[in-house]
Amino acid sequence: MIPLSTYIHGINPGEQIRLSILNELLNQRCLEKITLKPAARILDVGSGLGLMTECLSKKSGPGGYCLGIERDDEQIEKAQKHQTPELEFRKGDAYQLPLKEDEIGSFDIVYSRFLLEHLSDPKRAIEEMLRALKHGGQIILSDDDHQSMILYPEPEGFQKLWTAYIDSYITIGNDPFIGRKLPRLLLDNGCKEVRNDLVFFGDMAGSPTFEAYTKNLSEVIATARNLMIENELISPDEYASAMKNLITWTKMSHATAYYPLCIATGKKF
């Protein structure tokens, strides 16, 4: 039996808003790392609300086709409202992509972001992505390595809070350090010309996006609150104090955050 995945952040309306903000902050930076030939066929696995999928479709240009696969009912319903002949969304699972027979091995690009960290068997998901990719096509994986978060000056209690957040991933079988492993996963799946890169996902006080950035940070931690406390990774008082200090930090004129999003690319031959 293929192990199921667990999405730590939940699927409530607040999480959908957070994901929209996250896309606004990050999509353009990620697009700058991607080179597409005109009219490319693109598959986005774990497409969520479809905002990045739509960006990929626009970048591909006239004659291109972009297919987003997402398993969550609410997210796929919202994404499908933006469908066009060149942009399609389907409900499906990363372990068993809902592809037609003539779509197997037909995509120029397979893209996946913020998916593998939530899967119990990322290698199996990559195998399925490569099944969809044509020979000579490129797979692009982007994901977190949570140990890379740096806040300056560090709010009191943040280190324990962030460690508890990381450990909450581990308690449900997810991988908070998947980002550093992406090149190895591609090599283990037979990819060639494997390369690694980073997208800077930091910010600082005074930036026009800092408020949205820190809102995303505090909300993503809050999604794991119950899991952290139930597993005694942090006490309720320690959590409340650290979150209060984090909010205070966001008001500092020199508050600075550094965080890299890990990328790995490879080709199928």
Where are the language model's segments positioned?
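A short acidic, Gly/Pro-enriched loop at the edge of an enzyme's catalytic core
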Residues: 98-109
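Conserved alpha-helix/loop element of class I SAM-dependent methyltransferases that forms part
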Residues: 21-38, 55
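A short SAM/SAH-binding and catalytic strip from SAM-dependent methyltransferases
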Residues: 108-121
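Class I SAM-dependent methyltransferase Rossmann-like catalytic core
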Residues: 3-24
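A short glycine-rich, Lys/Arg-flanked "PGG" loop and its adjoining helix->strand segment in the class I
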Residues: 123-138
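Class I SAM-dependent methyltransferase SAM/SAH-binding core
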Residues: 43, 49-97
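Conserved Class I S-adenosyl-L-methionine
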Residues: 195-269
